[in-house]
């Protein structure tokens, strides 16, 4: 931590350059002369901790100006995207936040502006800080001080002892009442503690144990936003494990609680279902970090570039896929002839994901992405078994790419993590890697356009055969595509002949 001097109770001094960001000059230029602006929260905390500025930059401001107008003018000046975020709840002290988001890859900036009201400026600031979540986030500096030339003695406002707590490695709630007023702060506390390597204080844990469901009093959109911020962490598995152990995750997603019902997963697993699930997420984060070791640069070209829910990506969705990949197992658990089975748990799981996504208001795009991962998470293992037997055919590989090509890198990474968390033998993991390599090679060299769709469409088939719409048309299209994949049909003329030959055997299926 930087060298901080104590001025008086609740005040310290620190060199202003510690807090500087070039965009602060732009804020100052659109701030009306008669108004003030303070930098608060995580930006101040991280600079005091001496952390480097990363690619994801979040800054919170308190201002005596109209935050909406200030944010609008700031967004216009820097070319950012402006929006207003409304917090719900009668106890929320800052219900309206004006935000500006700017993406300059690889950097992502978010600036939030909240109102500061009161005749006595310093008193209003101190009162606001005392209403915040954790002492580490209840620290502020004046924007003017940060921008002053040679600001060696910038005053740092710290009425709740946040700096002392940071020095001791603690993350302490400003008060339990503040957590009760805005319970989504519970999720934030677990995340920040892991992210910043801080120890949450005992009063926080006692509060959570007393009522893990209190988080549900917050708006579902804010819960979802905080959960996705957790998944954005490189070590999200640590936060998720704590949320699970303290009952918070189950309160939000009751389906997660059912995982502990399955103690025995059968011969292919070394952990109970809940531990296997948490381990899969843990291994996945390692695999994501080392992804270039497992997949080609070509396949990874667009990995992490799909945007969802504003500031999040397909990487977070992949982590949700890991957490939910076996969510259908409790409902499909059975013992048949002495063997544990989970028939169609992938299909059941995909439907459960859709229900969760709708409840947490993920939106269709994010929900369907995760549902598709869950629905097809077994595909790489089926293909591995075919590969081990020497039965991996063109048709199977082509079907995979045609049906799962958009999520292929995600499925591959998930399958590797799933195998590790299942305790697969080294030779089986090696076979999985070889299967993935074979699939990649096929996609790169042989997955031509003509085997991704039939050479004849439905209208053409009906015209050739002189038939009306019916099941036979779909059956013939599928048979034609499989013949193309197998290399038996390569031209349109061959396709016509194939359809004519196939009609005699298939025609009875269209009757009745």
From Swiss-Prot:
Q: What is the effect of changing residue 132 to A?
A: Strong decrease in CMP incorporation
Q: What is the effect of changing residue 133 to A?
A: Strong decrease in CMP incorporation
Protein task: tRNA nucleotidyltransferase involved in the synthesis of the tRNA CCA terminus. Adds the two cytidine residues to tRNA.
Supply the CDD domains for this chain. Answer: Cas3''_I, NT_ClassII-CCAase
Gene3D superfamilies according to UniProt: 1.10.246.80, Beta Polymerase, domain 2, cca-adding enzyme, domain 2
GO MF entry, a single one: CC tRNA cytidylyltransferase activity
Domain comment from the record reads as follows: Adopts a seahorse-like shape and consists of four domains: head, neck, body, and tail.
Q: Which SMART domains match?
A: HDc (SM00471)
Q: What is the effect of changing residue 85 to A?
A: Does not affect CMP incorporation
Q: What EC numbers are recorded for this enzyme?
A: 2.7.7.-
What changing residue 112 to A does, per the record, is:
Reduces CMP incorporation
Taxonomic placement: Bacteria, Pseudomonadati, Aquificota, Aquificia, Aquificales
| Cysteine pairs bridged by disulfides in the record | none
The name of this protein is: CC-adding tRNA nucleotidyltransferase
Summarizing the annotation, the consequence of altering residue 222 to A is: Reduces CMP incorporation
Recorded source organism is Aquifex aeolicus (strain VF5)
Keyword check for Acetylation: no
PANTHER family from the xrefs? Answer: CC-ADDING TRNA NUCLEOTIDYLTRANSFERASE, MULTIFUNCTIONAL CCA PROTEIN
Q: Which GO terms describe its biological process?
A: tRNA 3'-terminal CCA addition; tRNA surveillance
